[in-house]
Structure formats: C-alpha cells, structure tokens
Amino acid sequence: MGFLQDKVVIITGAAAGIGLATATAALDEGARVFGIDLAPAPTSLQENPNFEFLRADLTDHDCPKRAVQACIAAFGQRIDGLLNVAGIADNYGSADSVTDEVWDRCLAVNLAAPVKLMREVIPIMREAGKGSIVNTSSKAGLSGASSGVAYTASKHGLIGVTKNVAWRFKTEGIRCNAISVATEMGMTGDFSLWDQAAMEAMRPIHAAHMDMGIGATIKAEEVAQTLLFLVSDLSRRVNGAVIPVDDAWSTI
C-alpha cells in the first residue's frame, strides 16, 4: 500500500515533464489522479483505471470549475490534494521591453489559474476538514536575477499566495506549500525571440548553478518526489513552506 493510497489528487500540467512524472509517481503510490493539460493525455497513463484526464486551457474562465466538477464525477465528492504544476516561461523580457501578450499570458497561466483552482477545491477540502495544496514556483520566485519580469512576477506572486492560503486556512485542516524549482526543463521555443540583453544579464547566475551545455541537472522524477511528500500525510505539519528543489541554487 502506497503513502497516497486512495487519495484523490488533481495535477495540472500532467501531460509532460514534472506534471507527468508526478502523476505517474502518485499512481504508483496508490492515488487516484485527475490530470489537466492543454496537450493530449499521456499515452503512458491512458490505460490506468485510476487516471482521468481533461484536455483544457487553464486560462479559460470556466476551466477550473469544469475540471473540479469532472474530477468529482470521476472519483466522488472528495479532493485530497491539488498540485499546481503547469507553467510557462516568458521571453526574458525586462520591464522596459515586456509585451502585453507575454505579461498577460504568463500571469494568467502561472498565477491566476492556480488561484482559481484553489478557489474551487478549498470548499471541498473545508467540508472534509483536510486537504493539501502544493504550488510549483521557481528560483525566479525567490530571486530577481534568474528570469524575465513577467515570469519573476508570476512566481513571486505564487509564493505570496501560498503563504496567504496556508495562514488563512490552517485552522480548517488545509495546508498550502510550494516548491522552488531550478531546472532547464521546458526551456523550448524560438530563442531568437527572447530578450538577449536580459538573458546575458542573468547568465552569471545561471552559470553558477548549471552547465548550460548539458541541460537539466535535476530530473522531473526528483522534483515529483518532493511534490508528493508535500501533498501526502507525511508532511502533515508542514504548512506555508517554500522548499527549494535546486541543488543549493537558492543559497546564492
């Protein structure tokens, strides 16, 4: 019997990367997982009877409500955990160059969507008298010297939300924690569109942590283990924490 046996857990970004690794590991620990992603459902999990999936854009105004309703329809009136893993990068734009499109999209996916999902699950958790929410922040949630202004704002904001929710609902059995991840995973796209001057300004900080030539130093599966610890009863007294998963990058 796994340490998440029969727990119902919602995981965003479940089609790939950290989200998929977390969904896979949660299922291995006995959880019933409801995944959400803009991409198609992962083929590796489609045959698992304890996995349900909603393909949707988290920024659609009705997506959080639809997702929670679909989870309840699949697994019953119970949500033990919410893992907000989905996120997008910006183009490293600074305050003098960030476009409205990049700013709005980054804040919508990285900050607004997690908050709106929390708004939907907290009443269910409150009724049960327990629940655990884990948000995925970043080195950029702790530092101003690792990414663009939009991504930095969104991840700082998510840490603030985490602490606010932890304090507000601590007497109702609801916990809220965050991890701060440092990894190159997901760094895709047309790099020619990125703010090259801003990237150069961040390069010394990046170089202090990872060899940019060999890619990620932290595996998705390693990040997933910390997420699962925080959503599980193993961390029942951990609340309002921000745990770095960054191989000591947060020390600089």
Swiss-Prot record:
Name of the protein in its database record: Short chain dehydrogenase andC
Molecular-function annotations in GO: oxidoreductase activity
Keyword Signal annotated: yes
Annotated active site: 137 (proton donor), 151 (proton acceptor), 155 (lowers pka of active site tyr)
A biological-process GO annotation: secondary metabolite biosynthetic process
Statement: the UniProt record of this protein carries the keyword Endoplasmic reticulum: no
SUPFAM superfamilies to which the protein is assigned, alphabetical: NAD(P)-binding Rossmann-fold domains
The enzyme's E.C. designation: 1.1.1.-
Knockout consequences: Impairs the synthesis of anditomin but accumulates preandiloid A.
InterPro entries: NAD(P)-bd_dom_sf (IPR036291), Sc_DH/Rdtase_CS (IPR020904), SDR_fam (IPR002347), SDR_superfamily_enzyme (IPR051122)
One family name in Pfam for this protein: adh_short_C2
Record keywords: NADP, Oxidoreductase, Signal
Pathway: Secondary metabolite biosynthesis; terpenoid biosynthesis
Family per similarity comment: Belongs to the short-chain dehydrogenases/reductases (SDR) family.
PANTHER family found in the cross-reference section: DIHYDROANTICAPSIN 7-DEHYDROGENASE
